[in-house]
A protein has these predicted regions:
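Single conserved hydrophobic/aromatic residue that forms the stacking wall/gate
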Residues: 1-11
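Glycine-rich adenosine-cofactor-binding loop
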Residues: 14-40, 166-174, 184
Length: 214
């Protein structure tokens, strides 16, 4: 059923571990860039194929495992090593071609704005690395997902991820001082809503640590 298919697609979200795995992005424009920005951060080995590739995508090569192939997509380009293909182009017939090949090989395929050609969908992401908030409409309305993401973007501070960094710094010491799980949970709930959190969000982790441990 459609509901069952949506649940299956939802299971494979964009937090899947792709480190050192081969992925293909078809398209070299703004949409492809959005997909690439999260994909390269997973540590995936990514190939981009498109007749024209945006300068912002080219710039990603400097720090990430990214291979650029400046040519029109052909079925031969989708080789068996690719575990995931993202089709981010409106070139006629390309999404259908890529979908047919990927499905036949039992691989994951996501065609932007074509949920009928996807066996994996990706939620809209609010990125406060390493905190990531995923918003999904299960493929019913990508525009709604992006709208909700916009609401959250306005409300979640840019430094929110620093709270996770603070937790990482204090992980071992809190386990030693507070061996009881419930006590440790209460401690963190207090920290995340107090002055230590404010300091961390402002990127003053030393001050945040002092406030947390005083």
């Amino acid at each position: 059923t459609a509901i069952r298919r949506q649940r299956q697609m939802c299971i494979r979200d964009r937090f899947h571990r792709f480190e050192d795995r081969e992925c293909l992005v078809i398209g070299g424009g703004v949409t492809a860039l959005r997909k690439l920005r999260w994909l390269v951060r997973t540590g995936a080995s990514v190939t981009v194929i498109a007749p024209e590739i945006a300068p912002e995508i080219v710039a990603l090569q400097e720090h990430h495992n990214l291979r650029l192939v400046q040519q029109i997509f052909t079925p031969e380009a989708l080789h068996e090593d690719f575990v995931l293909t993202i089709c981010a182009t409106n070139a006629e017939g390309v999404s259908e071609q890529a979908h047919s090949i990927a499905i036949a090989r039992g691989k994951w395929i996501n065609c932007v704005d074509r949920t009928d050609l996807c066996n994996v969908i990706f939620p809209a992401i609010v990125d406060r690395w390493p905190i990531l908030v995923a918003v999904s409409s299960m493929g019913q309305s990508p525009t709604l997902s992006r709208t909700v993401r916009g609401w959250l973007e306005q409300r979640l501070p840019m430094g929110l991820g620093k709270l996770a960094d603070l937790a990482g710094r204090l992980r071992n010491v809190t386990k030693e001082r507070l061996p009881d799980v419930d006590t440790r949970k209460a401690f963190w709930e207090q920290i995340f809503s107090g002055p230590a959190a404010d300091a961390a969000i402002k990127n003053d982790l030393d001050q945040a640590e002092q406030l947390a441990l005083r």
